[in-house]
């Protein structure tokens, strides 16, 4: 996945934590990895890898890889380390979202699954998809925002 986040991001890095979901609000909280979380059956372990691709100093285009796959994981995990996804109205920064909307006409979160690689060994009925790769171009609003970052075209087009 690729995402456009707030700030200049150092990396690459791997981050860990625990995710706890509030069913009433459909929102998750990221907790630091500690003994208390390990004992809480509702706190699920999460691990996310990311690598900055390019930046304009105010925003960074990241490549993100889920090691665990939890609902809202990328959005909440990046927000918890101070780099929320632009256009994310649930976990994002209101000022960043406002700028993305006003300057780049962003209407949704700047998170894009550009490539999906299927595992080689799959059972029926998906066996025929084993080893295949699927790609999708980013939406126009994603491209508009990314275009402000020097070198973005090396990573997305």
What are these language model-derived features?
Residues 1-157:
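RNA pseudouridine synthases
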